[in-house]
Amino acid sequence: MQQKILILDFGSQYTQLIARRIREANVYCELHSWDVSDAFIREFNPAGVILSGGPNSVYEDETPRAPQSVFELGVPVLGICYGMQTMAAQLGGSVENAAKREFGYAEIRAQGHSALLKGIQDKSNAEGHGLLDVWMSHGDKVTALPEGFKIIASNSATPIAGMADENRRFYAVQFHPEVTHTKQGKALLNRFVHDICGCDQSWNMPDYVETAVQRIREEVGCDEVILGLSGGVDSSVAAALIHRAIGDQLTCVFVDNGLLRLNEAEQVMETFGKNLGVKVIHVDASAKFLGDLSGVNDPEAKRKIIGREFVEVFQQEAAKLPQAKWLAQGTIYPDVIESAGAKTKKAHTIKSHHNVGGLPDTLKLKLLEPLRELFKDEVRELGIALGLPHDMVYRHPFPGPGLGVRILGEVKREYADLLRQADHIFIEELRSTKDADGKSWYDKTSQAFAVFLPVKSVGVMGDGRTYDYVVALRAVVTTDFMTAHWAELPYDLLGKVSNRIINEVRGINRVVYDISGKPPATIEWE
């Protein structure tokens, strides 16, 4: 019988990161809403249960609670943030609003020699106590322990930052071990699933491919599927996976919306149509997209328009395929969670995505999203397992709305043409510039692109005054795209990119570099 971990989702923005960390530990896990039935939990038969964080307060009326059967199964349970608070409240402890909230980095002291934290530390203090650098995000705190529990972590702001009932193997932490900012978070989760729950390392990507292929075949049957192919990593891997499952039942639709990267249409048709043998229909809808975007400044409105146009094009192409019943998309989990599209519908909305927002009620095709619960690094790993070329799989992500969300405000063909050229120069220089170990800066960064700013600045070229547009460069380093650090590119590289853009792209006379992290900023500007 396969060992597996059940994650109950209370609506945190970070919930799927828990699943990602468990999968990295080669343990199978599934994420389900907090309100699943007791019968489901018993049938699932987990080796352990993790309660996620969430935006609610346990002392308010009608807030989520873990099914009571979770605490009656006799298996280990780990509560994280809100998961700790609901565990405490449900088992007889107390939770109150914190006078001092904690958001961001914090240092906690491990204590009590718990099975969860023993030997896990970043450093120690003068007394020899283990200290951990962690990521906090809470406005409430546990103020009284349930019977049988002891404190296993604390700091001055949160005296009960961790608790444990060793006899029942119930553990909880107020911080978020699933985010990369908690340096020992992976070690903590590995300790829980391997040592405390007793799971072995039996789950891997080849197994996932086999499972996903079988699931697609069962879901689709003999129907035909159309997929919106952008040439980006997500849609490319989705196409390869679906093609592996159903072959020529898949038809890819490549839509040129006028918002693509330089020479992208030609590259996509060459790669998929000729090299991979996938059926691809090329639709040039650039005039329609740009026309509908004329005069629209609001980023959410732009995303909705772009999403609507994509769906309309797919519907038109589907009408030419009488057996087409499914619209496939390369939606991945960060798309879903940033649109509050998680299963609980509790996560706070940050921005909508064309894959998960903007789909009209009149859509006559069923949605097939085989990558919906995978993170970007898992999608890349899946692509390699499917035999896709390395350069394709490790290409930087490109948003579904394309340059439409990299042009601030109104989208015009002139702006798109300028941005295309600037972005191409930036990526070209990142690819050709190597560090001391011979690795390109393109490979060292997770995502890099240019952003068009619809403002003009004064400049001088030769003996003449210029009054032209501004471009911002954005490059980040991340493992999961839920949090990210700005990339510390060499000054000489930035200088060369700036010089080339200003000299080669007529209409741009100033280049700036974005040094914002995520959070507080998102990776894309819109």
Curated annotation (Swiss-Prot):
UniProt feature coiled coil, ranges: none
The EC number(s) this enzyme carries: 6.3.5.2
Gene Ontology, cellular component aspect: cytosol
Domain of life from the UniProt record: Bacteria
GO molecular function, one term: GMP synthase activity
Keyword presence, Transcription: no
Alphabetically ordered keywords of this record: ATP-binding, Glutamine amidotransferase, GMP biosynthesis, Ligase, Nucleotide-binding, Purine biosynthesis
Top enzyme category: ligase
Organism: Methylobacillus flagellatus (strain ATCC 51484 / DSM 6875 / VKM B-1610 / KT)
Ranges for domain GMPS ATP-PPase: 203-395
Binding-site residues for ATP, renumbered to this chain: S230, G231, G232, V233, D234, S235, S236
Complex formation: Homodimer.
InterPro entries for the chain: Class_I_gatase-like, GATASE, GMP_synth_C, GMP_synth_GATase, GMP_synthase, GMPS_ATP_PPase_dom, NAD/GMP_synthase, Rossmann-like_a/b/a_fold
Catalytic activity: XMP + L-glutamine + ATP + H2O = GMP + L-glutamate + AMP + diphosphate + 2 H(+)
PROSITE patterns hit by this protein: GATASE_TYPE_1, GMPS_ATP_PPASE
Pathway: Purine metabolism; GMP biosynthesis; GMP from XMP (L-Gln route): step 1/1
Protein name, UniProt field: GMP synthase [glutamine-hydrolyzing]
Function: Catalyzes the synthesis of GMP from XMP.
Residue ranges annotated for the Glutamine amidotransferase type-1 domain, each copy included: 4-202
